[in-house]
Amino acid sequence: MCPQTSGREKAFLKKLPLATYRDIVSQLAELGCKEINLQGSGEPLLNRNINEYIKYAFDKGIDCNIVSNGFNLDETMSEKLVQAGLKNIRVSVIGYNTTQYAHWMSKDAFSTVYRQVHRFMQISKSSYTTISSYHLILDNDRIEHEIVEYRENWIDPLGIDAEIWQMHNWGGQYDTPYERDKKEKRSCGRPFAPYLNVRAGGIDGKHAAVVPCCYVLGQDSKAVLGHLEDQSIEEVWNSVEYNALRQAHKEERFDDIDYCKNCDQLYDAPDSLVWSNIKGKAYGQHKIDKSFDFRDFIKND
């Protein structure tokens, strides 16, 4: 459904084996990790036993969040997610009415997803699990109009926590309908942050490839820093590849990194968050942890 799906590489369109996942989560627990996101490089609810993944992490003291298009959020799946201890599901809804949604999400499912989100809100009420929604501005000349449409057609009637953003360019792979202020180019901070991005697939037939960030989606093979299928987290974190990426960011040699050189995350764009009713939500924060800003980890020394 997502317009980004067509650009994904076949080697990365896999399901992460549960045994491999458990090994990774066990390492994370030993390292003191408290929270993970489980969407990786695809739609998490295509994995019909995603609840087993969530429950394993929950039992290790690690909260799980997912980002989903919500199309597979049926009643059974909703109950399984809540019972497993999911912390938050963020539903991606691109398009403020049935017509726009069908165009941008490539499926006429606006009403279906709306009903399923409403039901999930009832099922998860008074539980540990929360739900929110994420939306994009489609025409930058009509920002205020689109905010009103999203609110009237989705956010306000559901009473859901939501955020509306301008589009980003997926590591330079797509043209966006607006230009960021390009006066100050700087590191995004991600190579230095206590943050690990693991894909389900990998190169050479492997699973659990580590890549620098979510924005390399569609060009992951260029950005592999190691594989947790046959390496430990510590080995990948301290690898030659990871340290070379950090050094390039320290020296601001972004043009030397093919998957970084045209990425719009190298520029500040505080106006890209155009509206939110989430308390304390601000530009630069992590999707879930509002205390976590990647720019705080930028190192130029």
Language-model features, listed with the residues they occupy:
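Structured beta-strand/loop patches that form or line metal/cofactor-binding pockets in enzymes
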Residues: H168-L196
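Active-site and channel-lining beta-strand-loop segments
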Residues: A193-L217
